[in-house]
């Protein structure tokens, strides 16, 4: 456990936050706020930082790559490459990537099921021809024995 002494946190807006002394086991910066007041008596920030009067919230834009454009088309977000704007929100890219990931998983599930049926059909055909792993192994070992016997005869001559 750590003792956190009375700490001061300076915010960028010209205010100071005091935190009460307390015992904190993991996160020493967390704690109840005790008081907030301006940093200087004049009310201006001594560091010279002035906050902007008006803050505009513009969503972040992202320029999609060729691969991202293909994903946007494949997931049905846009009908053609020409319809895709030059800048798109990152959330749109993330959503389309997740949809593409799910579609790819469904395709892999389908291919796995098709492969299982293909293995079943080929196994039934092998049974009709009386082929099995045991018969293949016995034939291979018999061939090895014949080769070993021929090699022993050629050595003795």
Curated annotation (Swiss-Prot):
InterPro entries per UniProt: DUF1075 (IPR009432)
Compartmental location: Membrane
Domain of life from the UniProt record: Eukaryota
Keyword Transmembrane helix recorded: yes
One Pfam family matching this protein: DUF1075
Keywords per UniProt: Membrane, Transmembrane, Transmembrane helix
Cellular component, GO annotation: membrane
Name assigned to this protein: Protein FAM162B
Gene this chain is encoded by: Fam162b
């Amino acid at each position: 456990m750590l003792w956190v002494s009375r700490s001061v946190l300076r915010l960028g807006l010209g205010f100071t936050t005091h935190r009460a002394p307390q015992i904190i086991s993991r996160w020493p910066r967390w704690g109840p706020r005790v008081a907030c007041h301006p940093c200087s008596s004049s009310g201006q920030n001594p560091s010279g930082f002035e906050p902007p009067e008006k803050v505009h919230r513009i969503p972040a834009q992202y320029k999609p790559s060729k691969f991202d454009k293909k994903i946007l088309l494949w997931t049905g977000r846009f009908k053609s490459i020409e319809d895709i704007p030059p800048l798109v929100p990152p959330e749109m890219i993330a959503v389309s990537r997740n949809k593409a990931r799910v579609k790819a998983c469904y395709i892999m599930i389908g291919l796995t099921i098709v492969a299982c049926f293909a293995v079943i059909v080929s196994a039934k055909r092998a049974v009709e021809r009386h082929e099995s792993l045991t018969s293949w192994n016995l034939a291979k070992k018999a061939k090895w024995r014949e080769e070993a016997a021929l090699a022993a005869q050629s050595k003795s001559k």
